[in-house]
Amino acid sequence: MNKLIAFDCDSTLSGIEGVDELARLAGDDVFRQVEDLTNQAMNGEIPIEEIFSRRLELINPTRHQCLEIGKAYLEEIEPTAKETISKLKKQGWECIIISGGFVTCIEELAEYLEISSIEAVPLYFNENGDYLGFDSDYPTTRNGGKPELLKKVAKNTSAEHVVMVGDGVSDLETFGIADRFIGFTRYAARQQILENSPHIASELSQVLDILKDC
């Protein structure tokens, strides 16, 4: 039996919001603006597509800064993530990351967790590492993108059980494609997640108990 579990990255596998930390590197004013936009999007107050390019234009990140955020993801990794993912894989689960974050930032964390499949937004840089743009057609740059990707991966892997773990409204959108949605509240307890998630976990190790009958 093929089993697929997808994890959000920011405020789930790691305690930080990568885009906010990139903004912090650009200065206090940029950080405040970007943090506000991120919170509004994660709470479902404004569509993701409305803020995606605005945040990156404000930040103008370099490749080096993105790699620094990769290190920050590792430093702030959810304490039970490594062991939980290792146990899930031993139980036959295919573990993937589906994120509205950036591939360049997430790769180091994924490698540490031994997750080979990352569905996240590609950024483009010139030969000096200066920011050129992002893939504006990538599904997770808009609302509805995560269920689209989860459906594609589930089909490609012929998964009979599909699970999503995440903290935000964009993650909750996958419920229906995912036969189980687990709202994650360790770092952010968002009202829509608390009210609408069939399962809640405050640490990733609790995912193992929730899925013990699968």
Features from the language model and the residues they span:
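N-terminal glycine-/serine-/threonine-rich phosphate-binding loop
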Residues: 1-3, 8, 194, 204
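Alpha-helical substrate-recognition element adjacent to the catalytic core
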Residues: 3-122
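C-terminal cap/substrate-recognition subdomain and adjoining C-terminal extension
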Residues: 72, 76-94, 101-214
